[in-house]
């Protein structure tokens, strides 16, 4: 939503009267339905952001990684921001049972977190908001 309006919408209840743009058939559309939001289905998440930028819709529901990369300072949509999470996103990597790759990947994640590489990459690609500390 427009960064200038962000403080007016601290939670889902405060957004009840907004018109949202959401990707048709997406988890975003599911969240719009679940929350009883008014929404316009669009072809993809990039179009949802464009709808907000053009003023056709007041807000969009998109993936948090997409939001972090597409809106805010240093992007084409510097006057937009993201605010609340309507659900959680979790990603996983799977390997064949008995493979030693899971342990190797876990070691890589721990080492790249410890030496700052993971943070540097997250900063570089605009996904810091989705970074999960490795312990």
Where are these regions (language model features)?
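Beta->alpha turn/N-cap motifs
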Residues: 2-3, 23-26, 44-45, 61-71, ...
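Residue-level signal for nonpolar/aromatic packing positions in well-ordered secondary structure
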Residues: 52, 60, 93, 105, ...
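Short helix-initiation/N-cap motifs at beta->coil->alpha
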Residues: 7-8, 24-27, 40-54, 89
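Flexible hinge/capping segments at coil-to-helix
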Residues: 1-19
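Short helices/loops that flank or line small-molecule/ion binding pockets
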Residues: 13-16, 33-35, 46-61, 65-66, ...
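Secondary-structure junction motif
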Residues: 10, 20-35
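Periplasmic-binding protein-like
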Residues: 28-31, 64, 68-125, 128-135
């Amino acid at each position: 939503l427009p960064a200038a309006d962000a403080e007016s919408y601290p939670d889902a209840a405060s957004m009840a009267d907004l018109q949202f743009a959401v990707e048709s058939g997406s988890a975003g559309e599911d969240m719009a339905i679940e929350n009883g939001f008014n929404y316009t289905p669009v072809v993809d998440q990039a179009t949802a952001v464009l709808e907000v930028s053009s003023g056709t819709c007041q807000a969009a529901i998109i993936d948090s990684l997409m939001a972090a990369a597409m809106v805010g300072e240093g992007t084409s949509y510097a006057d937009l921001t993201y605010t609340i999470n309507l659900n959680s996103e979790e990603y996983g990597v799977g390997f064949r049972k008995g493979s030693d790759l899971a342990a190797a990947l876990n070691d890589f994640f721990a080492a790249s977190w410890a030496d700052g590489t993971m943070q540097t990459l997250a900063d570089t690609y605009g996904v810091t908001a989705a970074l999960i500390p490795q312990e």
